[in-house]
Structure formats: C-alpha cells, structure tokens
C-alpha cells in the first residue's frame, strides 16, 4: 500500500502517473463523485437511486482501471457485493482488504492490519453526514428492490471491473492482456467476441475467494471454467440453470416439481412451492408473491373510491382515467391510426398501438402473403387454405380448424351463455362478443374510415366498408361468377342457388334467407312500428322505409336515370326502371315462362296461377290479390276519399281516378286512335272505341259503303 495515504483524511488517490511524473496532480475519489444530503436523497425516486448506484460503480471502476490504487470506499464495497449497503462494525471485521480483492501485491504484514484499516476507513465515512444518510437510504432501498433478485440468483461475494475501452486508450499506463469489464448480474449476456484472458483478473478472483473463506475446490474450479470461456457469471443454488453461451438459450429447472422453463423470470414466477409471500393485504389479510397481485387485490377493496361517469355510469379508479373517458362522449377523439383506422383518446395509446404495425412479422404465408408474429399463428392460418378441420363436434358433426372454436360452438348445443349484458339482459357465449355488444349501448365506435370518416364498432366492419372505396370484391360465387365484398354476403347469395331458407316465422310459417328479413317480417305480427314520420304521423317498422317515405314530403329524388332523366326516391325503383332501357327481365314465371323486370309485378302474376287471394275484406268478405287493393276497397265501406282535386274540390278514393279527372281541367287526351285519330283522356274509353274498328260489320248499306254489326 502506498505510504502517502493518510487514513485520517478522505482517501487521496495516487496513481502511477503521479509516481512517474506523467500526471500533474493527484485525483481523489471525492473529486469525481456526486454527493447528496439526506433531504436530497429522500427526494430521489427508485430509478434515480439505481442510476446513482450505477454511476458510482462505474466511476470507481474507471479509477481503478487507469491505475489508481485506492482503498475501496464502504458504500462501493457494499455495492460490489450486491448486498444491502449498511455500515455496521460487526460486518466490517468480515471485510477483506480491497487491494487483495483486486489482486494487488500486498505484503503479509499489511494483511494483518486490514481489520484496523477497514475500521478507520468506515469511521471516516460514517462521520461524513451525507454518506451516512445515503447508506441508510440505500439499505432501505435494497430491501425493496433486491429481495426477489436474491431469491432468483445468489451473486458472488465480489465483482471485478475491467474496462477494456478505458485500458485500450492512449495513456502511459501499461497493462498486459487487458480484460473486459464484466459485472455480476442475473441478466448477464454472452459476449459476441471471445475476450482475451487476463491473468491478473483470474488470480485476483481466486485469491479473493480464498480470503473470504469460500469453498475453494468448488468456486475456484467454476472460475477456471468461466474465465477460460471469457465469461463471468454466478450460479444459483436454488435452481439448476443451463445456458448455451453461443445460442443464448436458457433452460431452468425447478427442484420441487421439475418443471422446465425457458427463462429465469418464468421459473421465478413459477417457484411457488417454497417462495415466501411478503406482500400482505391490510384489508383481507391475503398474501401475494408479487406486488402487482397485491395492487390488483387492493383495487377490489377500493370500489368505494371509484369515479363514476355521469353519461354512461361506467366507473374508474383514477380521476385521470375518468377525464380521459369523458372525451369519448364529447366526440373529441383526435388520435386515429392511419394504418387500420382504429381510434384512441390518448396519443400515448396510439403510439403504443402503432408498434404493432411496425413490428417485424417473419412468418409469411406462401398462399396469400399474410405475415404473422409467431409460427403457431401461421400454422393456424394455413388451415384456412387447406380447409383442414381437425376438431369435430360430436353433436352435429361440424368441423373446426381450432379447438377453441369448437369449444365456443359446443355452447350452442348446451345453451350456455354465461356473459350477460347489464343493460338489456342479452346473453352471449363469449366475453369478447359481450364487449362488442356493449358498445351499442355506449355508442363507442373505435374504428374510423380515413376516406369518408364513417365510424364502426368492430374492425371487421371497417375492413368490409373500406372495400367499397377500393372496389375490392374477393369473394366470388362459383355458380354464377358474381363477386361480393364480404363472406357473409356470399353465403346469403348461395342460398339463392340452393333454395335454402333457414329462418322460419313461428306465427305463419313463412321462411326467409336472412335473419334480418325474418325480424322485419315478425313486426307485422306484433304490430311494432317504432319509426314515426314527424310530418304525417305515419309509422313504419323499418328506419330505411321511413327515410324513403320522408322524401315524399321533401320532394327529394336522389336517383336519376341517365337515359331519360327520370328521378326516383328509392334505389330499388331506380334499378327496376333501368331494366326498361336494357330490356332485362330477370323474374321468369315457372308456370308459363312469362318474364318481368320487377319483383312486384312477378308476384302479382304468380297469383293468377295459384288463384290465391290472401287479402280478405272483413266487412264483405271480398278477397284481393294485393294488400293495396284491399286498402282501396275498404275505403268504399268507410266512405273515405283522401284524393281531392285542387281545381273543383271533388274527392276520390283512388289516386288513378284523380289523375283521370284532372285531365278534364287540363284538356289532356293521351290515348289516340290510330285508325281515325280520335283522342281520349282515359284508357277505358279508348279501349271501347277501338272495338268499333275491329268488330265484324257484315251488314252493309246498299246505298253506301258503311257497315253495321246488326241488321
């Protein structure tokens, strides 16, 4: 040990540069360290304290690496041992000389004085108020942060620091075979390059193990193997961990149940056999192995402190979460993902979500090009192409590619619906389906189309909608070649070819191809008409029909024919009209082969073959083919004449009668005879007139060419 070191003062660090005159002044450990008072130390959070600890250790390693032979400060000594940095006289006697710890050549007489040296050194640091406060705080902090780490792996008594970068820099210090700085950490990673073996480093660690009274035959043998491979790590006594240095694979096996885990963290969480449960709940007395489990339990007890949303009644624990959720009701949703259109209230959530798009997907499907994060996801996806269905339902024989889908399907047979909506009482077999359903009540639409701004509850609905902008129709019918934007539309279309109508009305037995059509039909029996026109008070069972009806009052006709310019209020009327120009008649009668361009005219014609008249007047018993004819007939019993002429005030029970009457005032005569040129204002008079030209006139006048039907 250098003779000029005064133990009664702060340890002055004299390096070899000072001895050979290459350095101008000495540097003390105090000159390069950061000092805190007790008040300042208490204001640091755990992350800042951890940073302080790492900086102190790194500074000390740099000083030692460039050749400064200094006494190891007490707090650094405790940090190197990875133990709680306490300062007690009982423990000081067990500490070893720091010079021998790092392999320095120390005379035998110096070793005999190591106990008094340590005592004097620690006393000096204890008298320093700031160091004393930090030591106590480090001890408390170590109790909290190192408890789980010590259970997982038991570090060696000392760690050695050799900074390869520092030692290789240009300086007057001469070091042979410099090693790499290695810290004894549980998460020590394997080196990419094989470092050179440092003889000084190896011998110092062997000597350090001997001085500390550890098992020489075991630890020294392990050290030879470690240093020979260029690595340093400590072995845990509680579990056997095998690590492949070159591949980085780690297999940890527990002692109790022999379960094999892929990572130490997984084994640590699995070791519930002998693990202590230090975290206890003050409310119910339950104990937990992890603090996160304790916090989750405490949230259950703090239900009384929840902040409830006044709009929808949803409750939140932190006030911040409630304020963020309230923006969903106000419509303030500024963060939209440009990749998939998903909406977020907070920008931080958007940034986290965007990582899913930028994340590497190495497993790619060769059939469709879709990529996945995991190989297992790719295997599941490939079953959709091969149509492989390994899991079959024992009840109905239906096959599925995944076991989870089979389990969900089997709930249909058992009738199990354990997830019920608190708003309407509707029950579901899956929790995810319930979550989607609850968005109907809350009005939450998280997926927005970036093209038109339309929002959707489910991502699948957004994907189907976006195809309307791109024109993509990936689902094609193999029978007729027609394409659709969604698989559900293709399945419904297939029923036209198969004639399948799986949805049957329980009241009248009528069947339908779609469930939505059945729901609309059932409103006829229940008389349910929720949608009422604000202008005339007429009620409808569908909102779409109400919207078309309101166009009568507004005069809006958005569908205009490009051929003749005629406009229509509904799209179905517009399509039917276009068939007049194209000559298309898709509805063909199977009885007589007659074709029609509209569905309504086709149904009217079919009744002529069946003679079916389902609409019967309850007053006189007269039956009609169409419901509109029955309504018109019933006006004769009630005396109702809703159609009034604005010119003369005359009223009529039928709208065609009003149109014929109005031609009297306008003088319009649209029906002209091609034989004689006579014109008429209604079709019935025109038809009667034409019989005068087509009738047989066998009785002729002998005086003229005029003929008569009767003699």
Curated annotation (Swiss-Prot):
Protein's UniProt keywords contain Nucleus: yes
Keyword list, A-Z: Antiviral defense, Cytoplasm, DNA-binding, Metal-binding, Nucleus, Repeat, Repressor, Transcription, Transcription regulation, Zinc, Zinc-finger
SMART domains hit by this protein: KRAB (SM00349), ZnF_C2H2 (SM00355)
MF GO annotations: DNA-binding transcription activator activity, RNA polymerase II-specific; DNA-binding transcription factor activity; DNA-binding transcription repressor activity, RNA polymerase II-specific; RNA polymerase II transcription regulatory region sequence-specific DNA binding; zinc ion binding
Positions of the UniProt region annotated as Disordered: 1-21
Record-annotated membrane-spanning stretches: none
A Pfam family matched in the record: KRAB
Compositionally biased intervals (Polar residues): 1-11
CDD domains: KRAB_A-box
Residue span, KRAB domain: 27-98
Reported tissue expression: Ubiquitous.
One GO term (biological process): defense response to virus
Subcellular location field: Cytoplasm; Nucleus
Superkingdom in the source lineage: Eukaryota
Induction details: By HIV-1 infection.
Zinc fingers (C2H2-type) by residue: 279-301, 307-329, 335-357, 363-385, 391-413, 419-441, 447-469, 475-497, 503-525, 531-553, 559-581, 587-609, 615-637, 643-665, 671-693
Cited InterPro entries: KRAB, KRAB_dom_sf, Znf_C2H2_sf, Znf_C2H2_type
Nuclear localization signal (motif): residue ranges: 359-362
Family indicated by similarity: Belongs to the krueppel C2H2-type zinc-finger protein family.
Task of the protein: Down-regulates the expression of several chemokine receptors. Interferes with HIV-1 replication by suppressing Tat-induced viral LTR promoter activity.
Identification of the protein by name: Zinc finger protein 175
Source organism per UniProt: Homo sapiens
